[in-house]
């Protein structure tokens, strides 16, 4: 399993399933909007807006029908399943071509969401961030993008002049994703087993991203429970989550627990293995020399 910036490419592929990838989803949104518009009574003169009585135009605009060529291009883009870097480049090109051809498409949010994932896999993190932001501007509840950005931004370089702001964004994205995940509905074409694994991966990534963001913001005590949730009992834990958990626990002088976290990281194939082995060795040595409270 290949790890990219501490996040598995497998995890991102699973998270992409949360993105609405079929015409049915977009049509469902359009149909629901039209239904709500038909049911909404005309605004009465003198009424004041409120949650119970929002003021809306007497005749709500009806979305334009989808151009058959646009629909075909959208389907073609979402039917792509890249298996190698060349395929990822083709997927990105198809998405960019769609945006140029249909800049006002009702499918824009879904295309930006898919492109954000594709740019992560390339990897082109600047474009991932740019398209992810555009996707969230159109739908702030896109769990795929929330988790992607929330899991990736905390792993950025500290010398980025905007890094502090990105950490705050990541914290916000991960918290919102964790709010949405318990009630997220199963996408079409996904089995119950796949959906269970999908939610587990998304939840793990959100907790891990939040924990790393908190750790790098200096909120070490708050970071520990998030990183523990990201690593405890999950099927495919992220070695970076284990590693940062070890660092956090060691900084709190909980050396025995830190050694366990580093050991968890050392057992996973990644570029962090040597550092985790050393971290485990150092933590065990400090734990052995640490004064223990007297037994009662």
What does each model-identified segment do?
Residues 117, 151, 155-158, 212, ...:
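Residue-level recognition of tetratricopeptide repeat
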Residues 73-76, 112, 146-149, 153, ...:
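TPR repeat positional signature
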Residues 24-110, 293-296:
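N-terminal leader/linker segments that initiate helical-solenoid repeat arrays
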